[in-house]
Curated annotation (Swiss-Prot):
Source organism: Ruminococcus flavefaciens
Descriptive protein name: Lantipeptide Flvbeta.f
Gene: FlvA2.f
UniProt-annotated location(s): Secreted
Major localisation: secreted
Propeptide residue interval(s): 1-27
Entry keywords, A to Z: Secreted, Thioether bond
Lineage, highest ranks first: Bacteria, Bacillati, Bacillota, Clostridia, Eubacteriales
Residues annotated as transmembrane: none
GO-annotated cellular components: extracellular region
2,3-didehydrobutyrine: residues carrying this PTM: T31, T32
Length: 59
């Protein structure tokens, strides 16, 4: 019975962990992306040339 309880207890947690990890990584990546780009606009030399520079200025 203990093994079955462990399996029953671990499986949902693992699924939740995976969902949680995905959402956290996505949120952190998104926040980092939009948090760093505005900083980059203050340092145009860091901004890549051409299209990317235009995108930086738009932000």
């Amino acid at each position: 019975m203990e093994k079955m309880n462990n399996i029953a207890g671990i499986t949902p947690e693992n699924e939740l962990d995976e969902m949680f990890d995905d959402s956290v990584v996505g949120a952190v990546g998104y926040t980092t992306y939009w948090g760093i780009l505005p900083l980059v606009t203050k340092n145009p030399q860091i901004c890549p040339v051409s299209e990317n520079t235009v995108k930086c200025r738009l932000l």
